[in-house]
Amino acid sequence: MSDAKRLVWDLPLRLFHWIFATCIVASYVTAKLGFDWMQWHFYLGYTTIGLLVFRVLWGFFGPRHARFSSFLHKPSAIWLYVRGMFSRNSTPSIGHNPVGGLMVILMIVLVAIQAGTGLFTTDAVVWAGPYNPAVSESTAGLLSTVHNWNFNFIIAAVGLHVAAIVFYALYKNQNLVVPMLHGHKPATLVPEHEAISSSQLLKALVVSLVAAGFVYWLLAHAPVVSDNTY
């Protein structure tokens, strides 16, 4: 039974993870490609907002290991984990480890800032976010600056995340990528009471519709809608 596995990461969470990562990379690429790709950059922004809403709701209503309560710990618990993090023989975490949980929150906050400021930004020539008319020119300029600079922090956070994956794979012999593909971890690591019984797909569908509805509402209530808005 050494090959037996138990479900830890639900399908909606896994789909979120990989679509979210794709949106971040694609947003960077379309921004660098410039004018001809800006409309796609904006569509990616809409998608990202929807994904953020989904993840926050899923953090309260999703299965066990998707919930914030399962991986947000007191500072003392985080410090205890950090102290033993460089031990090759440390027991792998079932869900997000305490440091990984902090990374989840950091990425949500950084990308929320990025997507939120994008709604107000302008290139002062052609393109402007749908909520740009709601703020003054100076405020729009400030938010555009934040939008541009904040992505540097996102890149740094992504780099740290990738470095952690490599560290766990090479130093601690823990593969964090494969379980995020199929959702399972060895039964020797995951007690039966810690595993999830299903991915709660019907609930995920409802949450997805709420997230999509929020994005629709947000754009429908923008002060001005034109062909060149975010």
Where are the language model's segments positioned?
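Membrane-embedded alpha-helical bundles that constitute the cytochrome b-like, heme-associated redox core
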Residues: 1-230
